């Protein structure tokens, strides 16, 4: 699981905090930057497959094979939280100039028989549930 309180807290946690607080989530730029999001359970599944496979000294890309823009990601997160908040756009920063990311998992499919199983929406539902349970526990 990701660090929810650190300096480099992921955007999804920041957005969940906005949803919890009823504040419009921030998107820097137009939200067109894409990433390949993969749920932690699929990462664990890939690690177990690598441990059990008859391969050594190999590295693998693991992803969901789906390019998702930050705008789309926020739309899914708002949907699974039944939120009507709208994003607030700010000027894009230049911290991360890579505009598109998509994992090529063909090697993992071939050598590990790995295929991701958790959809983006399912992963966002599980992240939301986990995070709100976590902050409830730490608040007590």
Predicted feature descriptions by range:
Residues 120-140:
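Amphipathic terminal alpha-helices
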Residues 1-13, 23-24, 28, 32, ...:
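Glycine/proline-rich active-site loop of Rossmann-fold NAD(P)-dependent oxidoreductases
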Residues 47-51, 74-77, 124-131:
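Hydrophobic "lid"/C-terminal helical patch
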Residues 19-20, 77, 81:
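Hydrophobic aliphatic residues
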Residues 36, 66, 101:
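Residues that recognize and position ribonucleotide moieties
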Residues 18-22, 50-54, 111, 130-137:
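Generic structural signal for alpha-helix termini and adjacent loop/cap motifs
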Residues 40, 59, 71, 93-115, ...:
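Conserved C-terminal active-site "lid" loop/helix of NAD(P)H-dependent oxidoreductases
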């Amino acid at each position: 699981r990701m660090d929810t309180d650190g300096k480099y807290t992921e955007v999804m946690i920041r957005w969940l905090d906005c949803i919890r607080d009823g504040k419009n989530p921030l998107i820097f730029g137009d939200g067109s930057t894409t990433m390949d999001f993969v749920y932690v359970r699929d990462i664990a599944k890939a690690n177990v497959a690598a441990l059990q496979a008859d391969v050594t000294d190999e590295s693998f890309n693991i992803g969901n094979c789906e390019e998702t823009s930050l705008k789309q990601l926020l739309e899914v997160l708002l949907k699974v939280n039944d939120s009507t908040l709208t994003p607030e756009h700010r000027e894009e920063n230049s911290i991360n100039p890579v505009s598109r990311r998509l994992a090529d998992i063909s090697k993992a499919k071939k050598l590990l028989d790995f295929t991701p199983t958790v959809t983006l929406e399912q992963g966002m539902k599980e992240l939301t549930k986990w995070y709100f349970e976590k902050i409830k526990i730490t608040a007590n």
